[in-house]
Regions:
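Active-site neighborhood of HAD-like aspartate-dependent phosphohydrolases
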Residues: 1-44, 63
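Helix-loop "lid/cap" segments that line or gate small-molecule binding pockets
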Residues: 29-32, 52-67, 119, 153, ...
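A short, glycine- and basic residue-enriched loop/turn
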Residues: 21, 42, 88-91, 123, ...
Length: 230
């Protein structure tokens, strides 16, 4: 078990700060339904949240042996960004939870920076994050590659093993673990299937929470364990 001190808290954005994954999924499924059977699309994409839209397109093209129209990618991404920017709600309790934790905070997301900034504003976390926003368009490879998490740690001058991550997706958990960081799995967003906690546990998360009210105590417990406090 990693017992080095925790010096930086890094949060995913979609599905952790804001309840956006279900909105993006709706847009993508509606857009792809003209090109493949919807029921089969839903089965294929079940549990793929956390992937970039481009990775989802590649998955669909491979599975159905089709080539999607080049303009569809940008159209659906724009639709999803607009819907999220105007309609997304913060995850219940996230602002209160993050403001009660006395650690520097960053966000590391598979979305584009302008989209992450919009979601941060919707969650009223601009001041708490203090500009520490890291996104897929800032790195060579998106999650599940560790690039965006490593960039956050490097920029803030914290060793990866001293970072604690909050993630909702298997994709994000794999990225954070590949970066050498500890992970708290969050299963409280509206898109999360009932068995998802088991999936995240099997990947190796350090702890699981189902509501943001649990986050401060969970972080405190992990910090105490690292310092020999329990």
């Amino acid at each position: 078990m990693n017992v080095t001190p925790v010096e930086l808290l890094i949060s995913d954005c979609d599905g952790v700060l804001v309840d956006s994954e279900i909105l993006a999924e709706r847009v993508v499924l509606d857009g792809l339904a003209a090109h493949a059977p919807r029921a089969e699309l839903e089965a294929l994409l079940h549990g793929t949240f956390g992937l970039t839209t481009r990775d989802i397109f590649a998955l669909v093209e491979q599975r159905f042996g089709i080539t999607l129209p080049p303009a569809l990618f940008s159209d659906l991404r724009a639709q999803a960004e607009t819907l999220i920017a105007t309609s997304v709600e913060p995850i219940p309790g996230v602002k209160r939870a993050l403001e009660s934790i006395d650690l520097p905070l960053a966000v590391a997301s598979n979305s584009l920076r302008h989209s992450v900034e919009s979601s941060v504003r919707r969650a009223d976390l601009v001041a708490r994050l203090a500009g520490h926003i890291f996104s897929a368009d800032m790195v060579a490879q998106p999650k599940p590659a560790p690039d965006v998490y490593l960039l956050a740690a490097r920029t803030l001058g914290v060793a990866p093993e001293r970072c604690l991550v909050i993630e909702d997706s298997a994709t994000g958990v794999r990225a954070a673990l590949a970066a050498g960081m500890r992970v708290i799995g969050f299963t409280g967003a509206s898109h999360i299937p009932p068995s998802h906690g088991e999936t995240l546990s099997a990947l190796g998360v350090t702890a699981l929470i189902a509501h943001m009210d649990e986050l401060p105590a969970t972080v405190a417990r992990l910090r105490a364990a690292a310092s020999g406090g329990q």
